[in-house]
């Protein structure tokens, strides 16, 4: 009985695979199958050929790792552009450069915020001092002599010459 279930399961899997292959081959999208197969063949060949080439390049040159890495990234970015992808592969060096640029910009903005905050604090202190000077202070008794300008009023007898110096005089002009 067990052998029959295993045989039945195997036949079901074969039938499923056959029906799947028939639906794939009947699909009009399969017109692109030769192109897809050729691209996959080229990629596989590049993969198989690049590993020994990289090993030789790493052994013969001291700085070849960066060169090979740059070449591989360039090749993959070119393939992605050919496939109309907007994304690109970046190396760690490029990511570090971008992170440094972002960190530098953040530092610059923090310094600007610090300067602006310092200026605002100084302005608030200045406004407080101006407010304190303009603040009306209550007094017990108000001296009105300052208001009506009578504090330094002198009488005619108190003037040195006996005349009021602010009195108008007669002036004659030559013609």
Curated annotation (Swiss-Prot):
Pfam families assigned to the protein according to its UniProt record, in alphabetical order: Rota_NSP4
Effect noted on mutating residue 48 to K: In strain: Isolate 6
Name of the featured protein: Non-structural glycoprotein 4
Residues of this chain annotated as glycosylated in UniProt: 8, 18
Keyword Ion transport listed: yes
Gene Ontology cellular-component annotations: extracellular region; host caveola; host cell rough endoplasmic reticulum membrane; membrane
Effect of residue 125 to E: In strain: Isolate 6
Effect of residue 6 to D: In strain: Isolate 6
Description of how the protein assembles with itself and partners: Homotetramer. Interacts with the immature particle in the viroplasm. Interacts with host CAV1, early and late in infection. Interacts with host integrin ITGA1/ITGB1 heterodimer. Interacts with host integrin ITGA2/ITGB1 heterodimer. Interaction with microtubules blocks trafficking to the Golgi apparatus.
Cellular compartment(s): Host rough endoplasmic reticulum membrane; Host membrane, Host caveola; Secreted
Chain's role: Plays an essential role in the virus replication cycle by acting as a viroporin. Creates a pore in the host endoplasmic reticulum and as a consequence releases Ca(2+) in the cytoplasm of infected cell. In turn, high levels of cytoplasmic calcium trigger membrane trafficking and transport of viral ER-associated proteins to viroplasms, sites of viral genome replication and immature particle assembly. The secreted form acts as an enterotoxin that causes phospholipase C-dependent elevation of the intracellular calcium concentration in host intestinal mucosa cells. Increased concentration of intracellular calcium disrupts the cytoskeleton and the tight junctions, raising the paracellular permeability. Potentiates chloride ion secretion through a calcium ion-dependent signaling pathway, inducing age-dependent diarrhea.
Organism per entry: Rotavirus A (isolate RVA/Human/United Kingdom/A64/1987/G10P11[14])
UniProt keyword annotation of Ion transport present: yes
Record note on modification: The N-glycosyl content is primarily Man(9)GlcNAc, with a small amount of Man(8)GlcNAc.
Main localisation: host cell
Family: Belongs to the rotavirus NSP4 family.
A molecular function (GO) term: channel activity
């Amino acid at each position: 009985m067990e052998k029959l279930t295993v045989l039945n399961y195997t036949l079901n899997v074969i039938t499923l695979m056959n029906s799947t292959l028939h639906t794939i081959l009947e699909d009009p999208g399969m017109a692109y199958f030769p192109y897809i197969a050729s691209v996959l063949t080229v990629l596989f060949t590049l993969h198989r050929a690049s590993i020994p080439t990289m090993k030789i390049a790493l052994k013969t040159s001291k700085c070849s790792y960066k060169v090979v890495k740059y070449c591989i990234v360039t090749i993959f970015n070119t393939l992605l552009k050919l496939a109309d992808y907007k994304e690109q592969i970046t190396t760690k060096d490029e990511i570090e450069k971008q992170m440094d640029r972002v960190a530098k910009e953040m530092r610059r903005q923090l310094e600007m915020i610090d300067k602006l905050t310092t200026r605002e604090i100084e302005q608030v202190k200045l406004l407080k001092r101006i407010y304190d000077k303009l603040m009306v202070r209550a007094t017990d008794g108000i001296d009105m002599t300052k208001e009506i300008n009578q504090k330094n009023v002198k009488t005619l007898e108190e003037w040195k010459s006996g005349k009021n110096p602010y009195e108008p005089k007669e002036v004659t002009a030559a013609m």
